[in-house]
Amino acid sequence: MSADVSTKPRGSLPIPTAPGESNECYRVIRTLGEGAFGEVLLIVNNKNPDMAVAMKKMQITTQANTNNIRKEFLIQQKLSKVGHDNFIRAIGMRTENGFHFLFLEYADGGELFDKIEPDHGMPTAIAQFYFRQLIEGLKYIHDCDIVHRDIKPENLLLTTSHVLKISDFGMATLYRNEGKERLLDLSCGTIPYAAPEVCAGGKYRGPPIDVWSSGIVLIAMLTGELPWDRASDSSYAYLQWLGNNNLDENPWRKMDVRALCMLRRILTDNVHRRATIEQIKTDPWFTHNYGKLEMTYGRPLKRARYADENSPDCNISSTQQADAVSTAKRRHLETPDKVAHVERQNASFSQPTRTEDLLLTQNIDMSQNNTNLLERMVCRMTRFCTKFDVPTSYRQLIHASEHAGYEVRQTADNRLLVTFREVSMMVTLYSLKTESRVMVDFRRSRGDGIQFKKMFLEVRNRMNDSICVDGQNFLEDCGYVPRKPQFVREANA
C-alpha cells in the first residue's frame, strides 16, 4: 500500500504484559545481545509463540549496579504509564536468584542502522519518515522530564510495520523535577553522536544534547557517513563545520539545501541558539513533502498475558508485529547444535562516570538486532546465499575476510568472529534444508554500525562469484532480508 511520509505509521497494536513469578509460562528462544553485566533474551509464551517479549537479564554485583538497573526500569516505567509509539516500553521487572530481569517490548524489525547504506545513506523521503518519528519520540520523552543521552542508530529499533522506537535507557536521567530544570554533568553517550558540551566535560542542559544527537543520526541516514569523530577542537572536520568552510565536501554535498539549513540550526555549539524540538517540527525540511513510500505491514502479534511480581498492574501498550512469514515457513534452516561460549564484549547497562568512558558504548551491542540460534529471525539486510555447501562457503568466507585485512577467529561450528580495529561481527552459516543453498548471516557484535556495514559489504564483494544469483529473491520471499521500500515522488514535491 502507499503511505504518505507525512503521516505516522499504523497506530494501535497489541498490548503485552510481563511474565509472572513462574518461569514455566515462557521459554527462551535466543540471545538478542550480550554484555559484560548481562544479556538480552527473546522469550515467548509456551502456549503461543507469537507472544514475544525481550528480557534483559543482569547479574546483581554491587548496590550501585542494582541502583542503576532499577533507575533504568523506573525511567522506562515512568515513560510507559501514558505510552507512545516511538519508544520501547517497559513491561515489568523481577529480581530473583542473584539476577535482575527487565522485561521490555520486543521490536522485530531490527535496528535503524541496518537500513543505512554506507557512503550513500537512504532516500530522503525514507530518512524524513524515520526522522519525524525520532523527533516525536524525543518530544514525548522530554515532555516526561527525561533525557535519553545516547541517541544513535543502534539504539533506534524498528518494527516490521516501520515504526521507529527509541531504546536503551541505561544512560537516561531525570532533567526536570516539578517544573524545575537541573543542569547535568555526567559525560556519557557515544562520542561521534555526543554534543560538544558533553565532550567538553562540563555541566549541560538535557534536551539540547538529544537534539544534537538526532542531527548526527539524520546525517548518517542521508549520507551513510558521520561528519566527525568528535565534536571538539581536536577535530578538524568539526572546526571546518563551525567555520562554514567545508560545505562542498562530504557529507554536506550529499544533501539538499533544506536539510543543510536545518542541520545548521541543530548542530550549533551555541546551546541557546540550537533548535528546539518544536522549532524542528516547523522547519521547511521537516514539513516538505518528499513523496510517498510503498509500505508493507506485518500481522500484529497476539497480546501476551503475564503478571509481574513487582508490577502487578503492568499493562503496557505495544507495537509488536509478527514476521511476514510464519514460524513454520522458517523451519527449513539448520543451525549447529553446539554453540561455543563467546567472550562477552565490554558493556555497561549503567552510566559511565568519566569522559573517556564515552567509548564504552561503542563496544556494546545490547540492541535487539543480534541473532544466534533461530526460531524467530529478525529481518536484516546483512545476509546472502552462496551456491556451495557449508564447508566450501566456510573456507571462502575465511579467505575473503583475511584478504580484506580482518582478524578471523572460529568460535563454534560454522561460526566466525571477524574483527577489524574496534568493530567485530559474528558470522554464521545456515544450511537451507529445502534449497541447495547456504545462507551467510552477519550481525554486529560490537562497534559502530556503519563501519560494520562497510565490513559486511567488503566481504560480500570479495565473495561475489560465490553468491547465488537468485538467493536474494529467495531471502526476500522468506522474510530474511527486507524488500527495499518503494519511493514515489509526488509531481508537486
Swiss-Prot record:
One cellular component (GO) term of this entry: cytoplasm
Spans traversing the lipid bilayer: none
Segments of this protein annotated with the region Disordered: 308-348
Organism: Caenorhabditis briggsae
Molecular function GO labels: ATP binding; histone H3T11 kinase activity; protein serine kinase activity
Biased composition annotated in UniProt, kind: Polar residues: 312-324
Residues involved in ATP binding: L32, G33, E34, G35, A36, F37, G38, E39, V40, K56
Family membership: Belongs to the protein kinase superfamily. CAMK Ser/Thr protein kinase family. NIM1 subfamily.
Role of this protein: Serine/threonine-protein kinase which is required for checkpoint-mediated cell cycle arrest and activation of DNA repair in response to the presence of DNA damage or unreplicated DNA. May also negatively regulate cell cycle progression during unperturbed cell cycles. Required for checkpoint mediated cell cycle arrest in response to DNA damage in germline cells. Essential for embryogenesis.
SUPFAM superfamilies according to UniProt: Protein kinase-like (PK-like)
Protein name as catalogued: Serine/threonine-protein kinase chk-1
